[in-house]
Amino acid sequence: MEAYLKKLCFEYQVDEKEVKELLARMEMVYLDKGETIASATMSEQSLYIIVSGILHTYTTSEGEDKTIRFLSEGDAVLCYNSSQYAVKALTKCAAYYISEEEIEELCASSISFANLVRQLMEYQ
């Protein structure tokens, strides 16, 4: 867990204390291989921080999938405006999850959380 936290803090240039506080408010979810967490047909907006496994972010144009990026341990993905892309698990995954409503509540209650979420969004 310590190595994972250090990677997350380094990758997104955030304080370890803030990340620990955010993770404490998030729910651990488990995704099956092939499970989609964002697509044009899904309206939910949420944030996932990957603990294990690999996610594939891609667009579909003229029936062909075009890779945007692959995500793995320590990466974060903010699922919003999903009409432009989809996110699917390539392997079984474990991830921390928080809904848009909970993100908004946290950001309204704390400047630190608002800055943390802003920094995570900048790396999308």
Model-derived features with residue positions:
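Glycine- and acidic-residue-biased ligand/ion/polar-headgroup-sensing regions
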Residues: G34, E44-T57, G74
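Short solvent-exposed loop/turn micro-motifs enriched in small/polar/acidic residues
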Residues: L22, A40-M42, C79-Y80
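Conserved short histidine dyad/triad with adjacent acidic residue
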Residues: Q13, E27-M42, T60-G63, L71-S72
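Cyclic-nucleotide recognition modules
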Residues: E62-Y123
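Short coil/loop residues immediately preceding or within conserved phosphate-binding loops
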Residues: M26, E44, S82
